[in-house]
Amino acid sequence: AAQWAEVAWVAKSLGFQMINLHGGHGWLLNQFISPKFNHRTDEYGGSMANRAKFPIMVCKKIKEVCGDDFLIEYRMSGSERMEGGMTLEDGIEFAEIIQDYVDIIHVTSGSYQDHVNTKAFSSMFDKHGCNLDLAAAIKEHVHVPVVAVGGFNAPEQIEEALAAGKCDFVA
């Protein structure tokens, strides 16, 4: 956790007002919360509350070092879209836990272990706004702003998503 806080402090000292923690797509923070990858039997495994302990430690350390005015945007996979991976229900449960330690939740999907089903942005074969359904479902359960990412290619589509309250920002 200290190394993440150190990097956040460097960003703050350079004038940045926030950091984006990449807790999705199978990277380390995601590996702790994913049932596909976290098979630990200690205090960091088992329930979602236990699996969320390390991401929480990272967020708390960043706030401790950088202050509450330094924002944390937490990027998470709302679903890993692969067998044995996080489901939307898991994503909602994690978002409900992590929301008290972050300022913004950024919803993507997939994992680098499964490139076919990773939806950081849409291809020409996917619907545009391919993660909006995940972001909208998570938004219903949290009190912090939610970002949806995934191929928003038209201003009208963005306006519609925002007006419908499905997300607070798009990326």
List where the protein language model places each region.
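Flavin-dependent oxidoreductase catalytic cores
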Residues: 1-171
